[in-house]
Amino acid sequence: MTSAAQPTTGVHSIERAVSILRVLADTPADADASHPGLALKSIAQEVHLSPSTTHRIIRTLVDTHLVTQDPVTERYQLGPLAGVLGRKYLSSIGLESVQPILQRLCSLTGESTSLAVLHNDTAHVVAQKHSAQALRVDHLTGRELSLHASTMGKILLAFSAQGIDTAVQQLGKLEKFTDSTIASPVELTAHLHEVATQKYALNIGERYDGANGVAVPVLPYGKTSQHIQYALGIQGPSTRLTPQRMHELIDACTQAAAEITELGLSVA
């Protein structure tokens, strides 16, 4: 009985450790410049574990350099090994070469830019550049965005290899995050057909009130297929990224996506 239970226990421990890493990864680097990182209590609340269990797991992550702890504030952040693994991953699929393109688009538009792939029914952010603006909207690398309530998610659905109707059906119940969220499968399906036709998606407060965005597909290199692996997006506060401004940025976003296409990225 003991030997049979061990693998299950090991899997649970790994899942819990990954949950902690995700929480730390989703914490903006400038969330609290004077006290960066998260306290143990905050992490435990986010992963729905007791502080003692969280501490036991996080000590292992610290020992393996996936997490670091500030000796003064005792707050936790991602460690150097997490950075090494992230860079290895980006390099393995060619994403390091995307960074200059994202930076140019960020500088041109004044807003944060990001690249996402379809992963586990989410739009998984694999690269990003932060705006220099004090008030901005960031999608941190590693973050998973709702497909139906994000611009990049809607692009990935609209150009899905399985077709829009099937892709929407597989989403199941659509969570309504704000009054602007499209939570009806019928409405979402119709909207995604429009997105596929116009080749861009807008988001006006569909995930967070006051946060808008525009995204376009990154077409596959050397293929006639319109089924895509990547979506490129620009995000910002609604005070700057108005509907008119988003439409003005579509051409710049499309041009940047074409440059990324020419890189011939591997499948993430």
Show the residue positions of the predicted features.
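A structural signal for short hydrophobic beta-strand segments in well-ordered beta-sheet cores
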Residues: V67-Q69, L115-A116, V218
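Short amphipathic alpha-helical signal-transduction/dimerization elements
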Residues: A25, G153, L157, A161, ...
